[in-house]
C-alpha cells in the first residue's frame, strides 16, 4: 500500500499539539507493517532543520496564489520515515508559530499556506515520477 500522509505538523519535526503526536507516530507504525508511506509537510524552519539528510527534489512552478515552491526530501529522525517538505520563503519562513504570528493572530494567508498540497494536485504530472521514485 502506498500512502502520502499530508499534515501541518509532525513530532519531532514540529509540534503545537496532539496532531503532531499522531502525525509523527502513525506513519512509523504503518511503515512497520510494510506500508510504503511518505509524509508531506510545510517546510517551516524547524522542519527543515530537523529533517535527516535533506535534499532538493524539484521545483513546482505557477501554483495559484503561491507561485513556485521547492520540494525537499529527507527522513524523520529516529524512524527514518521519508518526508517531503514544501519549501517556500513566502509561506513558511516567518517569526511566530506555524498557525499564528508572534502576537497570536492567525496568518491572513493560512488558507494558501495549508492548501498548497491541494494546489499541487494540478501539477501532479510534473512531479509524479520524482515523488514516486523518492
Please place each PLM-identified region on the residue numbering.
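A conserved catalytic-core segment of Leloir-type glycosyltransferases
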Residues: 43-129
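N-terminal subdomain of nucleotide-sugar transferases
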Residues: 1-75
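Alpha/beta-hydrolase fold nucleophile elbow
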Residues: 132-134
